[in-house]
Amino acid sequence: MAKEDVIEIEGKVVETMPNAMFTVELENGHQILATVSGKIRKNYIRILVGDKVTVEMSPYDLTRGRITYRFK
């Protein structure tokens, strides 16, 4: 997947699930299932309920995403 094809949007973590999966509510009100990107996992960045995050989504599947940044 080319970098130009991703959609970046901000959201808020609503629920944590097993296997580093999260339910994220986007700014537009939709809820998606998101997983943690490799760099966040490698650097042991903790993501908790209520955190504001940036999510990358593929234009082909708008129900799933990848968390790429956690705001402080």
Swiss-Prot record:
General function of this protein: One of the essential components for the initiation of protein synthesis. Stabilizes the binding of IF-2 and IF-3 on the 30S subunit to which N-formylmethionyl-tRNA(fMet) subsequently binds. Helps modulate mRNA selection, yielding the 30S pre-initiation complex (PIC). Upon addition of the 50S ribosomal subunit IF-1, IF-2 and IF-3 are released leaving the mature 70S translation initiation complex.
Xref: SUPFAM superfamilies: Nucleic acid-binding proteins
GO cellular component: a single term: cytosol
Cross-referenced NCBIfam families: infA
Signal peptide: none
Lineage, broadest ranks: Bacteria, Bacillati, Bacillota, Bacilli, Lactobacillales
HAMAP family assigned: IF_1
UniProt name for this protein: Translation initiation factor IF-1
Species of the source: Streptococcus mutans serotype c (strain ATCC 700610 / UA159)
Gene3D superfamilies in UniProt: Nucleic acid-binding proteins
Compartments where found: Cytoplasm
InterPro entries: NA-bd_OB-fold, RNA-binding_domain_S1_IF1, S1_domain, TIF_IF1
GO molecular function, one term: translation initiation factor activity
Alphabetic keyword roster: Cytoplasm, Initiation factor, Protein biosynthesis, RNA-binding, rRNA-binding
